[in-house]
Amino acid sequence: MTTLTARPEAITFDPQQTALIVVDMQNAYATPGGYLDLAGFDVSTTRPVIANIQTAVTAARAAGMLIIWFQNGWDEQYVEAGGPGSPNYHKSNALKTMRNQPLLQGKLLTKGSWDYQLVDELMPQPGDIVLPKPRYSGFFNTPLDSILRSRGIRHLVFTGIATNVCVESTLRDGFFLEYFGVVLEDATHQAGPEFAQKAALFNIETFFGWVSDVETFCDALSSTSFARIA
């Protein structure tokens, strides 16, 4: 078992019954010229987040944790995005940006596009699971819940973008399904002002889960590995 120092208190978990979830580390969300950038959100400080996710993934994989990668987006016809009868049609900033800038139509979050692809620095490995998702929450219209339950996984460690949107949405839905959710704060990034990051982390540690950081996470896993060897 591994005990992770976190806010508001430490949490103990079995790495082999825990998944590291990497949320939407796509060009759309982390690269200049991607959807968030074109929609007016600041992505200039995402490089350290990418590096921290690399570190967390390496440590988690070495500890025997399942790695799950999410990619947010839709089919080329945007049927999966929902039409005017869906609130997603009205609230998705990607869809609104394409309606406001017709030259971008078909380029944002389209499966198979550069925008949809994971950033070059973060590549899934054999044994990892890559899941497409059509909405903010990774539990909506995906097999995530059945994958986790079939493997006896009850603890989820979250990284990725955006903390206040897809990360928090997935963690909240997991909370309602009886999963224990931990966010590594320096391996996440918000969409919007810095206060959005702080507010999301406050919500998580106060109401829905736990908050830690990459160095603490890696140290905890390393200590567990040494204990097994001894």
UniProtKB/Swiss-Prot annotation:
GO terms for molecular function: hydrolase activity, acting on carbon-nitrogen (but not peptide) bonds, in linear amides. InterPro entries: Isochorismatase-like_dom (IPR000868), Isochorismatase-like_hydrls (IPR050272), Isochorismatase-like_sf (IPR036380), RutB (IPR019916). Its EC number is 3.5.1.110. It is an enzyme of class 3 (hydrolase). GO terms for biological process: nitrogen utilization; uracil catabolic process. Induction: Up-regulated by the nitrogen regulatory protein C (NtrC also called GlnG) and repressed by RutR. Keywords: Hydrolase. It comes from the Bacteria. Disulfide bonds: none annotated. The active site is at 24 (proton acceptor), 133, 166 (nucleophile). Belongs to the isochorismatase family. RutB subfamily. Hydrolyzes ureidoacrylate to form aminoacrylate and carbamate. The carbamate hydrolyzes spontaneously, thereby releasing one of the nitrogen atoms of the pyrimidine ring as ammonia and one of its carbon atoms as CO2. This is Ureidoacrylate amidohydrolase RutB. It comes from Escherichia coli O127:H6 (strain E2348/69 / EPEC).
